[in-house]
Amino acid sequence: MDRIEIKGYKSFKDLALDLLPINILIGSNGSGKSNFLSFFEFLNRLYEQKLTEYVALNGGIDKFFFQGSKITDAICATIGFKDIFYSFELKEGDNRFVFSKEELGNNSLYTAIGAFGNEASIKSYSGLSIGEHIRRYLSEIKKYHFHDTGKTSPFTKESHIQNDRYYLYEKGDNLAAFLYAIHEETPIVYNRIVKVIQSIAPYFSDFY
């Protein structure tokens, strides 16, 4: 993903942002950092066709509209990958979102892939080959929350170096086992991780 456009979502009335491989958000409390990150979780739930459940468990439709549904009547988003894109528009239905538009595009050409359902069509759509790239990306979106680094942090929990090595848990419970697996199986990748950290924290030497 190299560009994202969001309209009407939470604290974002109209946002257009070019993305790099690594993006750092800096701002005061309430400036929208958490809302921006939450949009990627929103995207993943949308792709997995679990948007209705996700919205219901996170405060209902009104919580997702910019300044509420009395001010905003639609959430629109476009995510771009070089010369291809995926876009959608959500409006309020009967206590749930309705897709008023869902499209795949290539340069200036676009194809409607679904409308007026409560869940996205992108996961099951197979009409365009460009959809496969976008599906793969959306399916792999994960939110990791590593805010708590105190004594009771998930980082301090024990993890099994065999059973907990396959993917990183959302709160970092298995960070040690996950990094150990990378160190043992793909040392080049492990060293790259260390060097990236050192690029912003030169005093860091290693994880052990």
Describe the predicted segments one by one.
Residues 9, 22, 48:
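ATP/adenylate-binding site constellation spanning eukaryotic-like Ser/Thr protein kinases
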Residues 14-20:
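Phosphate-binding P-loop
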Residues 33:
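Conserved lysine of the Walker
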Residues 38-95:
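Conserved P-loop NTP-binding catalytic core
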Residues 82-208:
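Electropositive, glycine-dotted interaction segments
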